């Protein structure tokens, strides 16, 4: 049985959800500490948040607190939400931004972090879109250890070619070498943007899954926040957004660290935006193809479901 | 209800074949003329949806297995290789990983529908138990599939679950070592999990065959929970009626599935699983996939490890005893006003347990989880046995046809 009054309720329910989703966005805009604490649910479920907040100051009494951030020390603010070209239904990558981001990777991040993708993928037209000649020239500037020895049985290095993976940083040829310097190995950046998150908490995580208010860019916002979170001038390894605030990576980038040639201001926030967008592309290079395919699939399925409904209704009408 | 095949082959070849292997007649009697209660609602389309999902998971899984490397130093990068270098590899992988979640979403709708309408009651006990076996096999398959990408959560989830077996008295440690193929989770474990992950779906398919067979012997339950009395008045033919309704239900379900695959493909996964497995770094917060969270919450709520494991498996095993735990002769919650309240409380209880399973352990979450776990078991062991004795049920309609007419459906034309 189809119950028409139920079907009529559906658009109303969708409208309510969208409104709630919009509220969730408004909440994100405010630089408030973790939103879930505000959720007024009477159940025991919300109890842990106040408990944790109460416990945090005690935990911090033992550790030396940096002077100019004492107030922030007790709380762990959520990364502020950025607007990304690759979010939403039709989001894609901004080629110029990815090219700037790659420049930052190459000059800054690449000194310590691996990025295990082949040079050739940098020519991805929906990604950074470098020309074939550019890729060839770029690859040749790297020295790559050949997979197999030469005819004398020696392992040798040669200039890179587009099909090679970007080699590990010269200073840290293996993760152990980097761990010895920093206390922790700098993670490979190829899937980094998908491997990082922050807790959205109830009820926001529900809205993040819904059409029109979907939010998939938690990893990007987290990375951007970390890069801009070195707000304590006295302690270079104190980060506002890093869980626990003590981060092994000293502040990697500041204003004017990388030269931009396209007129984009050489500001930390722009650097953070650009390199994060680049890393998001590196982690999800098929995003544009995925969303394009998705649109076609969605249109097909909605039309197909509509036709099936009409046929079903017509056939069933006979027996009522 | 079945077995009465009315199939008559039209061609001489068809007759020749039908006399030797009556498979066309079997399909005809099972999926064309099979009588379907005419009052089924859309909750009854999940059987067809689940069949589709099983096939979809097997097809995408077979393609993924062609490109995946079940070796502990290469598994993680081979998944990324699928995502980046294989043509439509990203599609196959996202279809498969989200497909698992969609499969469970559908199976939970199917199970809760069965509980709401008392579909486990006589004569459908065996049909129901086969369903519980499928659910168990699905959980084992999904768990082992989640280990294969060899991310942090794969590795540590496998550690937590396989360690459950060490709780078995005397032989526990030996069982765990046997499962691991070594003294810890390593390449040997990954290899056997891959092998079993490929095997189990076909075992599921086998039990699904039995499930459908049993269904076609006893016939479908229906929202009014009264059995078919008059095939002419109470039922419609499977094709075109149920076929079209299932097709529409499936198409709507696919829209939801496609939404996850194409727009929020990593929403249901844990970000930590994009970090390669590292036995030396324990994640701050180990959580299973969402569909196992309620059981994980029950496990963590019990302070004694062995008892926790017993409760975890008991929570699933109890489902198989539902036909005898529920003492009410009335099937459908439509005619059981008190049961209906307890049913929705039970649904809320399961969702609450799931949420608690995803949270970090604290005194308050443990307390809440104990409370909800107690309610979970009380639903099966106290509420269902007692309700049947005390509940005053509403009068049942005389037949399915009477129920349909009473609900105000326009009876303009006679049945075909």
Predicted regions located by residue number:
Chain A
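Juxtamembrane interface at the cytosolic side of transmembrane helices
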Residues: 290-293, 302-320
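Long, low-complexity intrinsically disordered segments that are proline/alanine-rich
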Residues: 27-72
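Extended, hydrophilic extramembrane loops/domains of integral membrane proteins
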Residues: 241-243, 249-284
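Acidic, glycine-rich loop-and-strand cores that form catalytic or ligand-binding grooves
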Residues: 184-235
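Sec/Tat signal peptide C-region and signal peptidase I cleavage site
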Residues: 22-26
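Electrostatic cytochrome c docking/interface patches
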Residues: 68, 76-103, 114-128, 132, ...
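C-type cytochrome heme c attachment motif
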Residues: 103-115, 163, 167-171, 185-194, ...
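Bacterial N-terminal signal peptides
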Residues: 10-19
């Amino acid at each position: 049985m189809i119950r028409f009054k139920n079907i009529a309720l559906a658009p109303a329910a969708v409208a309510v959800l969208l409104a709630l989703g919009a509220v969730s966005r408004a909440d994100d805009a405010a630089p408030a500490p973790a939103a879930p604490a505000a959720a007024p649910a009477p159940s025991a479920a919300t109890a842990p948040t106040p408990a944790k907040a109460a416990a945090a100051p005690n935990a911090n009494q033992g550790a030396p607190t940096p002077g100019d951030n004492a107030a922030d020390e007790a709380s762990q603010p959520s990364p502020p939400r950025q607007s990304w070209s690759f979010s939403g239904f039709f989001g894609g990558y901004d080629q110029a931004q990815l090219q700037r981001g790659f420049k930052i990777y190459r000059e800054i991040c690449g000194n310590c972090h691996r990025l295990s993708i082949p040079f050739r993928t940098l020519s991805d037209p929906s990604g950074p879109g470098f020309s074939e000649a550019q890729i060839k020239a770029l690859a040749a500037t790297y020295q790559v250890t050949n997979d197999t020895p030469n005819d004398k049985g020696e392992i040798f290095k040669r200039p890179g070619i587009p099909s090679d993976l970007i080699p590990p940083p010269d200073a840290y040829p293996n993760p152990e070498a980097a761990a010895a310097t920093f206390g922790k190995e700098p993670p490979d950046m190829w899937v980094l943007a998908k491997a990082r998150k922050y807790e959205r908490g109830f009820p926001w995580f529900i809205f993040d899954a819904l059409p029109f208010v979907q939010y998939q860019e938690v990893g990007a916002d987290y990375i951007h926040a970390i890069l801009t979170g070195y707000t304590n001038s006295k302690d270079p390894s104190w980060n506002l957004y890093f869980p626990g605030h003590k981060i092994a990576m000293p502040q990697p980038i500041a204003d004017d660290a990388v030269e931009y040639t396209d007129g984009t201001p050489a500001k930390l926030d722009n650097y953070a935006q650009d390199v994060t967008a680049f890393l998001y592309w590196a982690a999800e290079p098929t995003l544009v193809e995925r969303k394009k395919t998705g649109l076609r699939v969605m249109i097909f399925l909605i039309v197909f479901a509509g036709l099936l409904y009409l046929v079903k209704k017509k056939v069933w009408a006979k027996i009522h | 209800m079945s077995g009465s095949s009315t199939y008559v082959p039209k061609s001489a070849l068809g007759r020749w074949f039908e006399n030797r292997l009556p498979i066309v007649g079997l399909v005809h009697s099972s999926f064309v003329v099979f009588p379907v209660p005419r009052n089924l609602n859309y909750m009854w389309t999940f059987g067809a949806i689940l069949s589709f999902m099983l096939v979809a998971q097997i097809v995408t899984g077979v393609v993924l297995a062609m490109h995946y490397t079940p070796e502990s130093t290469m598994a993680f990068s081979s998944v990324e290789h699928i995502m980046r270098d294989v043509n439509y590899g990203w599609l196959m992988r996202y279809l498969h990983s989200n497909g698992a979640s969609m499969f469970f979403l559908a199976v939970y709708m199917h199970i809760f529908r069965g509980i709401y309408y008392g579909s486990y009651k006589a004569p459908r006990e065996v049909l129901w138990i086969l369903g519980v076996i499928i659910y168990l096999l699905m959980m084992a398959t999904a768990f082992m599939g989640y280990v294969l990408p060899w991310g942090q959560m794969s590795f540590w989830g496998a550690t937590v679950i396989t360690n459950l077996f060490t709780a078995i008295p005397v032989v526990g440690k030996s069982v765990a070592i046997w499962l691991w193929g070594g003294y810890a989770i390593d390449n040997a474990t990954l290899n056997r999990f891959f092998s079993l992950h490929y095997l189990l779906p076909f075992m599921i398919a086998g039990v699904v065959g039995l499930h459908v067979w049993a269904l076609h012997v006893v016939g479908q339950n229906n929202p009014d929970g009264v059995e078919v009395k008059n095939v002419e008045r109470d039922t419609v033919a499977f094709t075109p009626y149920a076929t079209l309704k299932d097709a529409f239900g499936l198409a709507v379900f696919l829209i939801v599935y496609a939404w996850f695959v194409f727009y929020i493909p990593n929403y249901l996964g844990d970000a930590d699983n994009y970090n390669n497995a590292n036995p030396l770094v324990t994640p701050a917060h180990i959580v299973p996939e969402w569909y196992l969270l309620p059981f994980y919450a029950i496990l963590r709520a019990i302070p004694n490890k062995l008892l926790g494991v017993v409760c975890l498996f008991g929570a699933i095993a109890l489902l198989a005893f539902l036909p005898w735990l529920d003492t009410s002769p009335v099937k459908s919650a439509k005619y059981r006003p008190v049961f209906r309240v307890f049913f929705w409380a039970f649904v809320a209880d399961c969702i609450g347990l799931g949420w608690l399973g995803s949270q970090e352990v604290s005194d308050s979450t443990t307390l809440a989880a104990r409370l909800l776990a107690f309610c979970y078991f009380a639903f099966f062991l106290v509420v269902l046995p007692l309700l049947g004795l005390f509940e005053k049920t509403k009068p049942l309609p005389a037949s399915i046809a009477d129920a349909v007419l009473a609900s105000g459906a326009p009876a303009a034309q006679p049945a075909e």
